């Protein structure tokens, strides 16, 4: 992820900093930015870098990101000028290695963004994302807007490994040439020169000096996501069954199996809801029909489709769900 040098009073009164963040598509970059904006109570605009093109070509003009922020601020210019703009998929506008035609969606977009990042007055339409003679325009100064750029940066790991392996193989105390080949946290060692090699132009990186990476979610993290947040999905289902005076529990092994299934889908925490809904559908339909049921326990066997949930009748011991229905 790349962060920009923007001056917000809530960021320790430090000079403004644009930020550059990198991480897998399932590492939670967008959710992190949304949470930041909500905690700071500032407007947020999210856009995809792949939709941006140089002015005059098909696609969204670069200034459209400021228009989206103005809309998020309910057309309040002062509010928008203290907001956050998150540009995702920034790796997709890397400079093309070999091209003879004008790169209107790559290097040209990076060049066009320089004006926004360095802080300038931008004329943007009110209530629209594209300029039109019939739409009134206002001036938004981008100097205090926090720009955050993020992307997955495929193949960046190989660039970092090549640099580190080359450095470690030089000198009397040289290490093995493949020392970093199995380093799982290789992205944490990223430097600006790696991003330049990837295809980000020096002028663009110069305005995004803060670079950090996000690790992919692990099974343990996914289990915590299911259990710990105030609006965790498990708590939502527990609350729904509480309305029928039924207690819902999940065995730790069951949660681990759900996390494993989510890891297999390779979409991060997004997969958790669909997986849990698959197993809870019948339970949410059948349990309210029987007023004698006091609790339901989701087991690993049920998640692995080797058994059924365990239920406890009021005043009785736990029974498999099919026995209870009988």
Q: Where do the protein language model's features map onto the residues?
A:
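AAA+ P-loop NTPase nucleotide-binding core of proteostasis motors
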Residues: 20-45, 49-58, 62-326
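Short, solvent-exposed secondary-structure boundary motifs
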Residues: 1-2, 239
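Pre-Walker A adenine-sensing motif
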Residues: 2-15
């Amino acid at each position: 992820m790349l962060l920009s040098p923007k001056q917000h009073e809530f960021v320790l009164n430090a000079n403004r900093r644009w930020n550059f963040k990198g991480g897998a598509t399932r590492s939670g970059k967008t959710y992190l930015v949304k949470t930041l904006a909500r905690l700071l109570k500032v407007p947020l605009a999210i856009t995809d870098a792949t939709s941006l093109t140089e002015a005059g070509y098909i696609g969204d003009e670069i200034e459209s990101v400021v228009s989206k922020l103005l809309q998020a601020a309910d057309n309040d210019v002062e509010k928008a000028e203290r907001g956050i703009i998150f540009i995702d998929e920034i790796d997709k506008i890397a400079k093309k290695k070999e091209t003879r035609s004008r790169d209107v969606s790559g290097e040209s977009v990076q060049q066009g963004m320089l004006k926004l990042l360095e802080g300038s007055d931008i004329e943007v339409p009110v209530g629209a994302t594209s300029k039109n003679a019939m739409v009134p325009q206002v001036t938004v100064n981008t100097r205090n807007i926090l720009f955050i750029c993020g992307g997955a940066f495929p193949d960046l790991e190989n660039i970092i490994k090549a640099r580190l392996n080359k450095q470690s193989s030089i000198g009397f105390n040289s290490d093995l040439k493949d020392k970093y080949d199995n380093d799982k946290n290789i992205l944490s060692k990223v430097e600006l020169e790696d991003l330049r090699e990837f295809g980000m132009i020096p002028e663009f990186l110069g305005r995004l000096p803060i670079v950090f990476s996000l690790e992919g979610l692990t099974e343990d993290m996914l289990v915590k996501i299911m259990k710990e947040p105030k609006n965790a999905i498990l708590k939502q289902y527990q609350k729904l069954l509480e309305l029928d005076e039924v207690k819902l529990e999940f065995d730790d092994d069951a949660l681990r199996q759900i996390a494993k299934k989510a890891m297999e889908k390779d979409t991060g925490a997004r997969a958790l809801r669909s997986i849990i809904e698959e197993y809870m559908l019948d339970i949410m339909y059948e349990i309210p029909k029987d007023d004698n049921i006091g609790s339901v326990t989701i087991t690993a066997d049920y998640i692995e489709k080797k058994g059924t949930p365990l239920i406890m009748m009021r005043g009785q011991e736990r029974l498999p769900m099919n026995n209870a229905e009988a």
